[in-house]
Amino acid sequence: MIKMIESYLKAGKIVSKVRREAAGIIRDGLPIIELVNYVEDRIIEEGGRPAFPCNVSVNEVTAHYTSPPGDDSVIGDGDLVKLDLGAHVDGFIADTAITVPVGDVDDKCHQMMDAAREALENAISTIRAGVEVGEIGRVIEETIHSHGMNPVSNLTGHSMERWILHSGLSIPNINERNTHQLEEGDVLAIEPFATDGVGLVTDMPQTYIFRFLRERPLRLVHARRVLGKIREEYHALPFAQRWLEEYFDAKRLNASMRMLIQSRAIYPYHVLREKSGAMVAQWEHTVIVEEDGCTVITE
């Protein structure tokens, strides 16, 4: 138990430090691939491992964007950049996110940033053993509405366990009838999203983040090797195809990834965008539930 808590606290300390550093380098003209490489490299330098590929979701893009191989995307003036990063220490995960405005953004963007940040603060203040999950969603929704914004209703926070980023319990961002009670020792990622749009996300066709699902009979020897490396390196945690390029030839890797997706050996995460094309802000912390409150490990 002591080792587990120490690992969570170390992972939280790492992502907090890297989040602050990365927020400071986000600027007009910065290639996204430079940002994600910086974040992931710094996590390793600080003694952790990336728990998932660094997400850099800009404007209406809401989640699951990381640089694919050869990404030429660049951050621009007026962009609203959501930076979502995670680290693990021996499989124990800390997950955090921040929204950074680049240059001149309008007042609505600042309002939605304030809404998401305050919703996170208010949600954390309600968390303790015995609190119903639905109560957290109510607090988040009411806070975001008080700023004249809408929560993103079909994205949620989540519980985490060792090597498992989403371990089964969803933490809603809206008021819903969920009477599940939090328990002491639960590890939760609380992540409100605020927007002036309709508050729904939809899939985009792109998939740049993946996760191991199961062993499958595979015709291609190379695909079997790729799947073995995925299982060995990342367990059940999300990974990016660009992470595998140091091990495999790019052309054969592309063919293997297609086969692994088709055989359902790995799960592809679609990039998500706000349905009405509106800007979105996000804030996130990881907490450990206690009898009379919680410890925020990513402050």
Curated annotation (Swiss-Prot):
Annotated function: Removes the N-terminal methionine from nascent proteins. The N-terminal methionine is often cleaved when the second residue in the primary sequence is small and uncharged (Met-Ala-, Cys, Gly, Pro, Ser, Thr, or Val).
Binding-site residues, a divalent metal cation 1: D84, D95, E284
Sites where the protein binds a divalent metal cation 2: D95, H158, E191, E284
TM segment ranges: none
Listed InterPro entries: Creatinase/aminopeptidase-like, Met_Aminopeptidase_Type2, MetAP_archaeal, Pept_M24, Pept_M24_MAP, Pept_M24A_MAP2, Pept_M24A_MAP2_BS, WH-like_DNA-bd_sf
Gene for this chain: map
Entry's family note: Belongs to the peptidase M24A family. Methionine aminopeptidase archaeal type 2 subfamily.
A Pfam family reported for this protein in Swiss-Prot or TrEMBL: Peptidase_M24
Enzyme nomenclature, EC number: 3.4.11.18
SUPFAM superfamilies (UniProt xref): Creatinase/aminopeptidase, Winged helix' DNA-binding domain
Cofactor(s) in the UniProt record: Co(2+); Zn(2+); Mn(2+); Fe(2+)
Subunit structure: Monomer.
Cofactor note: Binds 2 divalent metal cations per subunit. Has a high-affinity and a low affinity metal-binding site. The true nature of the physiological cofactor is under debate. The enzyme is active with cobalt, zinc, manganese or divalent iron ions. Most likely, methionine aminopeptidases function as mononuclear Fe(2+)-metalloproteases under physiological conditions, and the catalytically relevant metal-binding site has been assigned to the histidine-containing high-affinity site.
Catalytic activity: Release of N-terminal amino acids, preferentially methionine, from peptides and arylamides
GO molecular function, a single term: initiator methionyl aminopeptidase activity
Keywords tagged on the record: Aminopeptidase, Hydrolase, Metal-binding, Protease
GO terms of biological process kind: proteolysis
Binding site for substrate: H64, H166
Record PANTHER family: METHIONINE AMINOPEPTIDASE 2
Protein name: Methionine aminopeptidase
GO cellular component: a single term: cytoplasm
Enzymatic class: hydrolase
